[in-house]
């Protein structure tokens, strides 16, 4: 790797490294930069009239992400976090004072107040579903504001078998890549999501919750009808922003980096981000990604200091 071309305010600068370059743009950005640099599968690069400099068929492949389904229930009390006339005039002023003087109350909430790792089926060796309980009504990642009060529960598939990809739209470095997670393309993922949904609803329908619930804010779903559950999941499930795997570590033909994060066949280039994970972990990706950076710094210092 010779260096990098940097654009700032539409002006181009070229930088070079004395020892090696580190690529750390995430599971979407790292393969995008490599493909636009001519590193990756030849058919993907050449069709955009980019010079093909090194063949690595795994660049941009093996995309994995956690798919998540959210159930939301309206609540008949202002006890929980929400927006209403009662809460605006009678609750929020007191909550502000509680936070200012005692650091307690709803403004100390993490929103994800409780969680659980469960098995979608008893035959599973380890948990494959993660639940997040939230004491408020949030849909569409908070982009849509719901009036009133309620509670919700996220159901996340931890170990999906579906694999997606990141490809180029064009040779334009300012154009976003094509990102296709191919959620639920493996049939086992849907079956696990259906089983996980049923277990989640068993919890949400317990008396401790149901006696306060006014109605389900999403469309009604027949818990005994797998096809109804499947349709809801296909239409409403979404990402929780844990993409990995598009520059995976390994020694097989689809691997992009070795066990020192060095790009196969390219001198002086490492990838240091979540894209190097061969397989998505069964939990949040933040801490493991920090670990990757820490481990990479240790290996780099051992090589050069």
Language-model segments: which ranges?
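Short, hydrophobic/aromatic-rich segments at coil-to-beta transitions
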Residues: 1-4, 150
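FAD-dependent oxidoreductase catalytic-site/capping-region signature
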Residues: 95-288, 296-305
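Glycine-rich loop(s) and the adjacent beta-strand/alpha-helix scaffold that form part
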Residues: 3-100, 106, 171
């Amino acid at each position: 790797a010779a260096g990098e071309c940097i654009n700032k305010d539409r002006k181009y600068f070229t930088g070079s490294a004395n020892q090696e370059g580190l690529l750390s743009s995430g599971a979407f950005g790292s393969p995008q930069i490599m493909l636009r640099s001519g590193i990756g599968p030849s058919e993907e690069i050449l069709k955009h009239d980019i010079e093909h400099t090194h063949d690595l068929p795994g660049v941009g492949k093996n995309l994995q992400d956690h798919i998540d389904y959210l159930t939301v229930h309206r609540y008949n009390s202002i006890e929980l976090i929400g927006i209403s006339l009662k809460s605006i005039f009678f609750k929020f002023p007191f909550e502000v004072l509680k936070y200012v003087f005692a650091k307690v109350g709803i403004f100390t909430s993490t929103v994800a107040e409780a969680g659980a790792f469960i098995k979608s089926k008893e035959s599973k060796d380890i948990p494959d579903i993660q639940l997040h309980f939230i004491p408020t009504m949030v849909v569409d990642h908070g982009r849509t504001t719901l009036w009133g009060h309620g509670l919700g529960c996220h159901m996340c598939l931890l170990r999906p078998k579906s694999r997606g990809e990141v490809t180029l739209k064009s040779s334009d470095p300012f154009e976003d890549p094509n990102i296709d997670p191919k959620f639920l393309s493996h049939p086992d993922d849907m079956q696990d999501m259906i089983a996980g949904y049923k277990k989640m609803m068993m919890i949400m329908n317990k008396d401790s919750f149901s006696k306060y619930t006014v109605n389900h804010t999403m469309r009604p779903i027949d818990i005994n009808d797998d096809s109804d559950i499947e349709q809801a999941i296909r239409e409403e499930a979404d990402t929780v922003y844990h993409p990995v795997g598009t520059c995976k570590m390994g020694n097989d033909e689809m691997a992009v980096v070795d066990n020192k994060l060095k790009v196969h066949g390219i001198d002086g280039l490492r990838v240091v981000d979540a894209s190097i994970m061969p397989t998505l972990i069964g939990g949040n990706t933040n801490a493991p990604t920090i670990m990757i950076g820490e481990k990479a710094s240790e290996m780099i210092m051992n090589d050069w200091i």
